[in-house]
Amino acid sequence: MPDATLSNTSLGRLAWLWLTVLIVAVDQVSKYYFENALSLYQQIIVIPDYFSWTLAYNTGAAFSFLADGAGWQRWLFALIAVVVSAVLVVWLKRLGRDDTWLAIALALVLGGALGNLYDRVVLGHVIDFILVHWQNRWYFPAFNVADSAITVGAIMLALDMFKSKKTGETVND
């Protein structure tokens, strides 16, 4: 019977991949629901003047960056997502036992990246359905669960970096 301590050490923090799988699952189920419940650009007001459900397709990156490209951007962003995902898995595996905050952050970013990667490769676009706005004057670009996970994970990574600098901790390589 293998030693449980050795097993945990060799896996590093890969046990946090369950969070990645959960993010991908919630992301894909929510996208499937809204794609089947709404027509393109239809809005359902949830909180008047602030929050709506909608259906939008994004062929670009964040904020529709390069969305008007001829299709090459699909594969560029897919390649970037694959490389970033591989780096995140290696980073996650190398984390120490006490790096729970960082492990959660990496798992969130990885889940978001994989959720949007699936859309980009299989559908040719990313499905967005969350629309935050202020009256009819200001609209934040539509986004999805994967985008939210990436954002929360990135904020957690930034906070971890500032905490490490402030306390003089060494940053894990």
From Swiss-Prot:
GO terms (BP aspect): proteolysis
Coarse class of the protein's main subcellular location: membrane
UniProt-listed Enzyme Commission number(s): 3.4.23.36
GO MF: aspartic-type endopeptidase activity
One Pfam family per UniProt: Peptidase_A8
InterPro entries in the cross-refs: Peptidase_A8
Active site (record annotation): D128, D147
Keyword Ribosomal protein assigned: no
Membrane topology classification: Multi-pass membrane protein
Family, as annotated: Belongs to the peptidase A8 family.
Protein name: Lipoprotein signal peptidase
Biological source species: Pseudomonas syringae pv. tomato (strain ATCC BAA-871 / DC3000)
Encoding gene (name): lspA
